[in-house]
């Protein structure tokens, strides 16, 4: 199945694109998506560990199942003072 990934801030810079289309096996989870992204761009692995997945406007846990052609936005935490 294909998943459309919307990358924000530093992740878009690491992957050199604001959007990616990732092929995953049927029954894949958000954790599987993170793993595939880390394989694709190993330098992004540390940022992916803290990224929040958003699907259909709500938080998606790492064990949540993904569906074909679903869009997943990956948000990095904001820090500062």
Where would I find each of the regions flagged by the language model?
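Ubiquitin-like/PB1-type beta-grasp interaction modules and other compact soluble beta-rich domains
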Residues: 1-80
């Amino acid at each position: 199945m294909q998943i459309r990934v919307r990358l924000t801030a530093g992740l878009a810079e690491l992957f050199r694109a604001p959007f990616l289309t990732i092929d995953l096996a049927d029954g894949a989870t958000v954790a599987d998506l993170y793993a595939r992204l880390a394989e694709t761009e190993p330098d992004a692995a540390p940022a992916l560990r803290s990224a929040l997945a958003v699907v259909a406007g709500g938080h998606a846990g790492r064990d949540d199942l993904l569906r074909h052609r679903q869009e997943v936005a990956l948000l990095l935490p904001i820090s500062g003072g």
